[in-house]
Structures are given as C-alpha cells and as structure tokens.
Amino acid sequence: MSVLTPLLLRGLTGSARRLPMPCARVHSKPPREQLGTMDIAIGLTSCFVCFLLPSGWVLSHLENYKKRE
C-alpha cells in the first residue's frame, strides 16, 4: 500500500463527512402473532438445509475438485 493512500482516502471521504445526515425515526408495530417454537425450528432447519449443507458438501469434496482427470 502506498504512503499516499491514506491521504487520498481522507480527501475522498472528507467532503462526505461535512454533509448533514438526517436522523431516521423508524417505528414499527408489534407483531400480529408471536412466533412459536415450531416456527423457529422450521426456519432454522430450512436455513441449515439451504445454505450450510451444500457448502459443507463442497468443502468436504474440495480435494476431488482440485484433481485433474
């Protein structure tokens, strides 16, 4: 990294710091229905099956992908 990089970044972000930032006032209503234990279990299981299971399979078979046939 160059010595000038921090100076360049400071120059680019300096003008953005002076802009007024409006404060967001976000309010929401309470939920219509409380989530039950079964709903949470189904949600966590579906996240595991959709995201973690395929990535775990790819990572466990990584050596097979590296080999040239």
UniProtKB/Swiss-Prot annotation:
Pfam families noted in UniProt: COX8
An example Gene Ontology CC term for this record: respiratory chain complex IV
Annotated protein name in UniProt: Cytochrome c oxidase subunit 8A, mitochondrial
Organism: Nycticebus coucang (Slow loris)
Record GO biological process: mitochondrial electron transport, cytochrome c to oxygen
Membrane topology: Single-pass membrane protein
SUPFAM superfamilies (alphabetical): Mitochondrial cytochrome c oxidase subunit VIIIb (aka IX)
PANTHER family, per the entry: CYTOCHROME C OXIDASE POLYPEPTIDE VIII (PTHR16717), CYTOCHROME C OXIDASE SUBUNIT 8A, MITOCHONDRIAL (PTHR16717:SF1)
Keyword set, alphabetical order: Membrane, Mitochondrion, Mitochondrion inner membrane, Transit peptide, Transmembrane, Transmembrane helix, Ubl conjugation
Gene: COX8A
Annotated family: Belongs to the cytochrome c oxidase VIII family.
Subunit organization: Component of the cytochrome c oxidase (complex IV, CIV), a multisubunit enzyme composed of 14 subunits. The complex is composed of a catalytic core of 3 subunits MT-CO1, MT-CO2 and MT-CO3, encoded in the mitochondrial DNA, and 11 supernumerary subunits COX4I, COX5A, COX5B, COX6A, COX6B, COX6C, COX7A, COX7B, COX7C, COX8 and NDUFA4, which are encoded in the nuclear genome.
Membrane-side (Mitochondrial intermembrane) residue stretches: 61-69
Subcellular location, record wording: Mitochondrion inner membrane
Highest taxon above the source species: Eukaryota
Main location: mitochondrion
Functional summary from the UniProt entry: Component of the cytochrome c oxidase, the last enzyme in the mitochondrial electron transport chain which drives oxidative phosphorylation. The respiratory chain contains 3 multisubunit complexes succinate dehydrogenase (complex II, CII), ubiquinol-cytochrome c oxidoreductase (cytochrome b-c1 complex, complex III, CIII) and cytochrome c oxidase (complex IV, CIV), that cooperate to transfer electrons derived from NADH and succinate to molecular oxygen, creating an electrochemical gradient over the inner membrane that drives transmembrane transport and the ATP synthase.
Pathway(s) served: Energy metabolism; oxidative phosphorylation
Residues annotated as transit peptide in the record: 1-25
PTM entry text: In response to mitochondrial stress, the precursor protein is ubiquitinated by the SIFI complex in the cytoplasm before mitochondrial import, leading to its degradation. Within the SIFI complex, UBR4 initiates ubiquitin chain that are further elongated or branched by KCMF1.
Disulfide bonds listed in the record: none
Membrane-spanning residues: 37-60
